[in-house]
Amino acid sequence: MVQQESGTAAGEGPRIRMATPDDAEALLAIYAPYVRDTAVTFEWDVPTVEEFRQRIAHTLERYPYLVAESADGRALGYAYAGPLKERKAYDWACELSIYVARDAHGRGVGGALYAMLERLLAAMGATYMESSQAQSYALRSLRGPAYA
C-alpha cells in the first residue's frame, strides 16, 4: 500500500494521511449523521465502533483509506476505495466514498481527499473510479468532464 501525507502549513488545507483501524471512533462520528439523516449510505443503523474498525481494516487490505485532519489533529473527513464489483474483470475498477464532517463542508476537505485518493489509485493501476453519492458526483464534476 502506498503511504502518502500532505502538509498542514497555514493555507495549505487539511493534512491527508492513511487511516488505521484506531481511527474508527473519530471517523464513525463523521459517518453516523449520514446514516441517521440521509439516504446516501443505504444503511439503516449506525455501525458500532468495532464494526467500523473491522471495515477500515478490511478496506486497507487492498485499497487506500484516507483521513483528512485539521492542524490540531481533528478528523475533518475521510475517503476510501473499494471494489466496484466482485468479478475478476473489475479488478482495476473502484468505487469511491468520501465523507466530510458537517462543520468542515465547503473548506476543500472533500476535494483534497479526492485528489489524493485519485493519485494513489492511479499509482496502483486503477483505470476506472466511480461514486454514486450525489455530493461525490458534484465534486468530480468540478474537476472537469473527464471525472463526471
Region locations from a protein language model:
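A short beta-loop-alpha structural element at the N-terminal edge
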Residues: 15-29
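Acetyl-CoA-dependent GNAT
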Residues: 44-103, 114-116, 120, 124
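Conserved acetyl-CoA-binding loop of GNAT-fold acetyltransferases
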Residues: 144-148
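Helix-loop element at the rim of GNAT/NAT acetyltransferase active sites that forms part
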Residues: 29-46, 59
